[in-house]
């Protein structure tokens, strides 16, 4: 069984009867069991995945209508709600939290007969760029386990890169899909804000974060986007993409397309190897007929400061709900003295989260 096939190849193989979803999912679970002790991509594995794949195979054989995923095994970053499943955000604060509803992206994938293979690791509450800030231990880069996989969607990137699933969903605020995709040699895409519903995503920074796919190929990313994008009455920031087909023009080429090269982003302290790779990419785009023009965005110098100001402030507000009453551990509080209680409640957060909470309290004051 070739676990290295792309999403579109998997769909075609199952549709044609060359492979069964059940066998593929079973082999994927075996793969997880054999490699994930070293990689630690998964926080939980769905033991019912094979049963779900079996149901889909029955629909294929009987000629019933089958969703676009045809039983494809997909991993989900553990900050998205799947009903009746643990959703921990890689935090002790939510270690025992069981989601009471499905995120909209989960509902859409279920409608298209995806199989959720498990929930994957992240930096706690999606705050970090290495997946070292998980309360349940760091994930490892499958190309070299001495290296980090990037973050915060490190578990998503590792699971795709190590053939523990075909595709994954992550979330991206300041690079949390794109960064681990780069580190693990997968495709990571942060869609336009509002293109994908954030309903059921446990919030870090509402103004910036966005759910996005991690896949093996660009076509697979477009395939996933076709499924999970679109208007949602539960998220009033969503856009109506009018059932756009993101695969329709993917082979049409880029001749004549204008691409802006931000000059402030390719100078200064950029690493020489990164600069060289960027210049190679520009040359490749030009060889394919694109028009690459240098543009100036002088405000980009403030982007990191603006990012931390917005995200820390919103994170501080969002994290205020985790008070150990509605979420977190139960513990006796001596005399219910407030400062003692708050101090103990905050021990359920890791150092990176606490740091951002402190900044989030300081900045707006």
Task: Give residue spans per PLM region.
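A short helix-breaking turn/cap at a secondary-structure junction
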Residues: 190-276, 281, 339-343
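An N-terminal boundary/leader segment
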Residues: 1-51, 287-289, 352, 358, ...
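Short, well-ordered beta-strand elements within core beta-sheets of diverse protein domains
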Residues: 10-16, 75, 94-98, 209-216, ...
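Short glycine/serine-rich loop segments
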Residues: 101-103, 107-231
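Short helix-loop capping/hinge segments that flank enzyme active sites or metal/cofactor-binding pockets
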Residues: 69-89, 253-262, 313-365
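Residue-level signal for inorganic ion chemistry
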Residues: 28, 42, 49, 102, ...
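Acyltransferase
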Residues: 21-25, 54, 245-248, 270-297, ...
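Enzymes and membrane/adaptor proteins characterized by extended Gly/Ser/Thr/Asp/Glu-rich
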Residues: 35, 68-105, 129
């Amino acid at each position: 069984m070739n676990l290295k096939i792309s999403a579109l190849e998997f769909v075609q193989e199952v549709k044609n009867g060359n492979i069964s979803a059940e066998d593929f999912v079973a082999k994927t679970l075996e793969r997880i069991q054999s490699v994930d002790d070293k990689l630690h991509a998964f926080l939980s594995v769905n033991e019912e995945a094979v049963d779900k794949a079996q149901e889909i195979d029955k629909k294929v054989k009987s000629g019933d209508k089958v969703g676009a995923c045809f039983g494809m095994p997909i991993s989900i970053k553990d900050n998205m709600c799947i009903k009746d499943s643990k959703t921990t955000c890689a935090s002790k604060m939510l270690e025992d939290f069981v989601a009471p509803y499905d995120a909209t992206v989960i509902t859409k994938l279920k409608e298209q007969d995806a199989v959720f293979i498990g929930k994957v690791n992240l930096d706690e509450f999606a705050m970090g760029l290495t997946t070292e800030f998980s309360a349940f231990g760091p994930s490892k880069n499958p190309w070299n386990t001495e290296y980090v996989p990037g973050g915060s969607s490190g578990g998503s990137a590792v699971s795709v890169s190590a053939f523990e699933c075909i595709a994954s969903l992550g979330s991206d605020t300041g690079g949390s899909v794109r960064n681990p995709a780069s580190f693990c040699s997968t495709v990571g895409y942060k869609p336009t804000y509002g293109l994908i519903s954030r309903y059921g995503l446990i919030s870090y920074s509402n103004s910036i974060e966005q759910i996005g796919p991690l896949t093996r190929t660009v076509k697979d990313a477009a395939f996933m986007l076709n499924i999970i994008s679109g208007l949602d009455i539960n998220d009033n920031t969503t856009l109506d993409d009018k059932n756009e087909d993101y695969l329709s023009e993917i082979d049409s080429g880029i001749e004549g397309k204008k691409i802006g090269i931000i000059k402030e982003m390719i100078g200064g302290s950029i690493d020489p190897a990164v600069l060289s790779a960027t210049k190679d990419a520009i040359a490749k785009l030009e060889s394919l007929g694109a028009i690459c023009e240098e543009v100036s965005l002088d405000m980009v110098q403030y982007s990191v400061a603006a990012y931390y100001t917005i995200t820390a402030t919103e994170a501080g507000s969002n994290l205020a709900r985790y008070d150990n009453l509605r979420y977190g551990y139960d513990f006796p509080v001596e005399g219910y003295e407030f400062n003692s209680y708050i101090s103990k409640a905050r021990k359920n957060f890791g150092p990176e989260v606490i740091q951002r909470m402190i900044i989030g309290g300081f900045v707006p004051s």
